[in-house]
Regions:
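Secretory targeting and sorting signals
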Residues: 1-33
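Post-signal peptide N-terminal regions of Sec-secreted extracellular proteins
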Residues: 32-153
Length: 153
């Protein structure tokens, strides 16, 4: 497996990262070792990643939201998780998990179906998701992409 987790630096950076992916080899001991969650938020923690399954050579997008203990006691949900592919700097949505199962007291997560990363070996992949939280009648929604991309196969 060739897997490269790169910081987002625009289309040129994505092309450079794709070129570097052919020379960088990371061999995790399990599929979960390749997950690198990017998170933010204090009272409500929002996290997302592109997960690599070494056995099947596939990517999938994952997102989760958690009401942090000692925070504001929010209800939370995550929706519209997307796995995006970036061929030549263009964005193409490859998989979507809508996950409209409602509000949750402490946490929610969603995962897209997988895609064969070897079909597009030089493209970078990103995750985007919509995170929502509410307390009483007041609620907030944020759609977020971690400032990272993944290249692999």
């Amino acid at each position: 497996m060739k897997l490269k987790h790169v910081g987002r630096v625009g289309a040129t950076g994505g092309l450079v990262a794709a070129a570097l992916a052919t020379s960088v080899v990371i061999a995790p001991s399990s599929a979960s070792a390749a997950d690198s969650w990017q998170c933010y938020g204090k009272e409500v923690r929002r996290c997302a990643t592109v997960s690599w399954d070494n056995a099947s050579k596939t990517f999938r997008a994952k997102a989760k939201i958690t009401d942090v203990a000692g925070g504001g006691d929010y209800q939370v949900k995550v929706t519209n998780v997307k796995l995006e592919r970036y061929p030549a700097g263009k964005r193409v949505t490859m998989r979507t998990a809508q996950d409209y199962d409602g509000w949750h007291g402490t946490g929610d997560s969603a995962t897209t179906s997988s895609i064969n990363a070897c079909k597009y070996p030089h493209d970078s992949y990103r995750v985007v998701a919509t995170f929502s939280w509410k307390k009483g009648k007041a609620s907030e929604d944020r759609t977020w992409r971690p400032d990272m991309s993944w290249v692999g196969c």
